[in-house]
Amino acid sequence: MKGKSEPATTLLRPILDTYMDSAVALVGCTARGLDRYSCEYDVLVVTKDKLPPTSLKFGDVYADLIFVSENDVLKPGKPEQSISVALAKPVRDTTLVLSTGIAANLAVLSESARKASAARLGSALKILGRAEEAIAKKSILDADFWLLAGSYEFAYAWLLSKEVLPSPSHLLSQLRRVSRGASRWFEGFSMGAGLEAAGRAGCGARLEGVTVLHDLIRERPETGSGAATWPVARTETLSAKADELVTRIELAECYSYMGQELIDAILALLRPVSKRSIGALASGKDALLGERLIRQLGLARDEKAIRTGLDSLKEQVSHLARRSQP
């Protein structure tokens, strides 16, 4: 992604011109000092219109747009949203709604981080319970997926407990920074997320697999997503970020990032009532997930590897839960 050295007002001019009456801010990794080519612009647009998040490309710049109301900025409904606003960097703020919201949310940053961490930790416990249930039923594919999903929930809970807002494309960098003196925490995530398969080939295969999932979502309006929230630009952004990470030999980071993307995509495919399990997506004559695609996504661990990762992750989740108790 070129041109990152230019001022944000210059790079984001198409967005500023399109939403002329809106306050605009940078959020996400760019706003938090991770100004790297593999970090797209996450842009907060304050508007009265209720619009779904979207991705777009203009020139050599990729951007993910999140549309919010003034009330969402001043009084966010969720702790993680509060943290995101608190750490935002205004690009245009003529009405001072962003400045006011940032100040208000900074004042409660620690409380918001604590609540957000607790919510993610609770989610991790619930998801790991699904993984255990799947193992008991010998549904190995489901167990592999839910272990992967639980690993990311744990990682986010861990970062949020440190008042760090997770950045999926640079998650490992963030985890390494906060794991000094607590290597077992990082090891628990690594084993649960299957990072032993990380490498140039693994990242490339997973990227190809996730791209297929994006195509499947766009072809199926019954997922409730489709082209509106999964535009081609979203896939292009993903590919550009992955290419940059591979070029910089950040292969584990790339593989980790693809992991979160495949979780999001599969959950979108699971949304229809008839698709309650990964196995349901991978069986029958109309199966969406073939054996080759499953291997590309890295969802091919055996039961022993899954149990080992699950035990390691559960131990670290328990440690974080005990440490987080008042």
Regions of interest found by a model, annotated:
Residues 1-39, 44-92, 291-293:
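Metal-dependent nucleotidyltransferase catalytic core
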Residues 1-5, 97-108, 210-214:
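Generic hydrophobic, helix-prone segments enriched in Leu/Val/Ile
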Residues 8-9, 27-28, 40, 108-111, ...:
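Generic preference for well-ordered secondary structure
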Residues 9-10, 18, 30, 47, ...:
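Residue-identity detector for threonine
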Residues 14-19, 94-96, 121, 137:
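Short acidic/polar alpha-helix capping motifs at helix-coil junctions
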Residues 70-132:
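Internal, well-ordered alpha/beta segment that forms a basic, Gly-enriched binding/recognition surface
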Residues 116-326:
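Conserved nucleotidyltransferase catalytic core and NTase-mimicking acidic/glycine-rich helix/loop elements
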